[in-house]
Structures are given as structure tokens and as C-alpha cells.
Amino acid sequence: MVDNKQDVVAEFKLVLVGDGGVGKTTFVTRHQTGEFEKRYIATQGVNVSNMILHTTKGAIRFNIWDTAGQEKLGGLREGYYIGADAAIMMFDVTSRITYKNIPKWHKDLTRICENVPIVLVGNKVDSKDSKVKARQITFHRKRSLQYYDVSAKSNYQYEKPFLWILRKLTGDPNLNLVEGIALAPVDIHMTEDQIKQLQMEHDEAMNLAQQGQLPDEEDDEFN
């Protein structure tokens, strides 16, 4: 366990953005270990969680800023974004509006954080009630962002957004975790068939993208 700041080789501010209810807080609090600390900053209306990841470059700390519901009040204060080194933008695949609002969140974020690594994450892919299909998720391709399906409640692909961000921030594409992230027991088990179906849909979407056949966000089928 890392107990002190001297053991940490790098420290980064990571902000979570997206509509309320998409699962941002659940996503962060899946990390269950003594190295996870959470504190509330009243002046900003946010929770800041400290997550230490053990990598091939040493221990790296993320200070993860979560909105604490402030996004429901009509936007976030600039102080939320200032000094951010990276961001995870999250939507809920069972709610179309949360995906349609992603361009607004991206605009707010990049107005202050122009060139930080950003991962777009579609949460709740464990649900059979998905309203946002892989071929409809096109925003990341237009903005050259990384995208991952995740399920906070089943821990599906939990590590991938963090590992991608770490590689970007350190400039080391070969960086890896030397210890898995300690996670809470799953609330929902995803079947192998569900996972295979997700992969098949994303392979199909990638092929369509290469052929220039993916719909725009404004496409009628998405509204």
C-alpha cells in the first residue's frame, strides 16, 4: 500500500462529466480499497476521490472530481474544470438524452481544458434495455476521442478508461497496471453472450465508420 506522497511518482486531476443519473458516482465508488479516500469540497459542490493505481512506472494518484449532483442545477462551475489533466465523459446507454447532451458537456469541458485526454464512456451496458446502439455512438469519432462500453455494476471494462488515460498522460503506450484495481463485488453479472453481442455490435460499427456509413447524431433514427 502507498501511504505517503513520496511514494507517488505522479498525480493527476481527473474530472467526471455527464448528466445526472448516468452512474458517475457508482463508477468511481466501485474502487474498494484502503487507498481510496473521498472528501467533499463545499465551495465547488464536488466530491474528490483519491485513487492510487500501481503501474509499471510506479504508483500514480488520480484525484477524481465528481459533481455531487451539481450538474442537475444547470451546469458546473469553472473551478470544477480548471487544472484538470484528463476527463471521463459518461452517458447512460438506456437514456438517449444523456448521449445527446454529450456535445454540450464536451463544449463546456474543452472551453477550459483545451487539449486534455478525454474518454467517452457508455455506462449500463449490462442492461437489456439499451436505447443507444453502437452504430449510433459517433461523437467520439468526430472529435478523435477514445470510447469504451462499461458497466459500473458488473465491473465490465472498468480499468480500460483509466489505463488509456494513464498511457496518454505519461506518454508511454506500453504502460500497464502491475496490480488489478480492487473492486467491489459485482451487483450484476454480464453473460458471455451479452459481452459477445457488444463486441459484435462495435465491430460492425467500426466497419460502417470505415465505409462512412454511420449516422449523424441528428439522424432521425436517433431522435
Curated annotation (Swiss-Prot):
Positions of the Small GTPase Ran-type domain: 8-172
Entry's transmembrane regions: none
Q: Which UniProt keywords apply?
A: GTP-binding, Nucleotide-binding, Nucleus, Protein transport, Transport
Does the UniProt entry include the keyword Transport? yes
- Single biological process term from Gene Ontology: ribosomal subunit export from nucleus
| UniProt-annotated location(s) | Nucleus
Which superkingdom heads the taxonomic lineage of this protein's source? Eukaryota
One function term, GO molecular function aspect: GTP binding
Q: What is its main location?
A: nucleus
Where do the segments described as Switch-I lie? 38-46
Xref: NCBIfam families: small_GTP
Question: What name goes with this protein?
Answer: GTP-binding nuclear protein Ran
User: Which organism's genome codes for this protein?
Assistant: Tetrahymena pyriformis
